[in-house]
Curated annotation (Swiss-Prot):
EC number(s) recorded for this UniProt protein: 2.7.8.37
Keyword Transferase: yes
A single GO molecular function term of this UniProt record: alpha-D-ribose 1-methylphosphonate 5-triphosphate synthase activity
Keyword Iron-sulfur: no
Stated role: Together with PhnG, PhnI and PhnL is required for the transfer of the ribose triphosphate moiety from ATP to methyl phosphonate.
Homology family: Belongs to the PhnH family.
NCBIfam families according to UniProt: PhnH_redo
Catalysis performed (reactions): methylphosphonate + ATP = alpha-D-ribose 1-methylphosphonate 5-triphosphate + adenine
Species: Rhizobium meliloti (strain 1021) (Ensifer meliloti)
Lineage: Bacteria, Pseudomonadati, Pseudomonadota, Alphaproteobacteria, Hyphomicrobiales
Name under which the protein is recorded: Alpha-D-ribose 1-methylphosphonate 5-triphosphate synthase subunit PhnH
InterPro entries reported in the protein's UniProt record: PhnH-like_sp, Phosphonate_metab_PhnH
Highest taxon, organism lineage: Bacteria
């Protein structure tokens, strides 16, 4: 498949139904942080943008949601694919986007480089969509907070070594801060800024 043809293919076959399905899965995962949601819909974005990350983009992005992409994604067909299928524009400035996407293995900068919202409007922040190697099999972490009863153990594989430090700093500025969607293949795991994480 040529780079040009990749731009126009790989979106939802039934955009309304599939976007609604993905949206419900994401809302459920944000309401119950730490659970793994399996997306029942198929997206085939251009590499290196992953399947679940592409589905998130198709569901949440539109012309009112600027998007930031990692350097590798920016050099791929992903910017044109996202723009064609969602209408979202790509920005080079980290403090502007509503969503930021990272492919598997990409370096994730400090969360404070992105929009963190304000005390009055904490929702005006960036949601990071980060693909990891897997959502299980990594360093076990205990999650606590709203939507979590008695704690939950998560073990995403492929998080940066400094992730817990970044997350602790993010929680310290609540209600401001970023929210996080981890993806792997067709699955997602959501971590709102209210979730506290520590090593098991």
């Amino acid at each position: 498949m040529t780079a040009q043809s990749q731009i126009y293919s790989g979106a939802f076959a039934d955009p309304v139904f599939e976007a609604q399905s993905v949206f419900r899965s994401l809302m459920d995962c944000f309401a119950r942080p730490g659970i793994i949601g399996r997306l029942s819909t198929a997206a085939a974005p251009p590499a290196p943008l992953g399947e679940a990350s592409g589905a998130v983009a198709l569901t949440l992005c539109d012309h009112d949601t600027p998007v930031w992409l990692s350097p590798a994604l920016s050099k791929s067909s992903a910017p044109k694919w996202i723009a064609f299928h969602t209408g979202a524009g790509v920005t080079d400035t980290k403090d502007e986007p509503r969503f930021a996407f990272f492919e598997k293995g990409a370096a994730v900068p400090g969360f404070d480089q992105f929009a963190l919202g304000t005390q009055e409007y904490p929702d005006r922040s960036t949601t990071l969509v980060v693909e990891v190697e897997a959502l299980e099999g990594g360093q076990p972490l205990i999650g606590r907070g709203p939507g979590i009863k008695n704690g939950i153990v998560i073990a995403p594989k492929g998080l940066p070594d400094v992730f817990l430090d970044l997350w602790a700093a993010n929680r310290a500025i609540f209600p401001r801060g970023i929210d996080l969607v981890l993806t792997a293949r067709e699955a997602v795991l959501c971590l709102p800024r209210t979730t506290k994480l520590e090593r098991e």
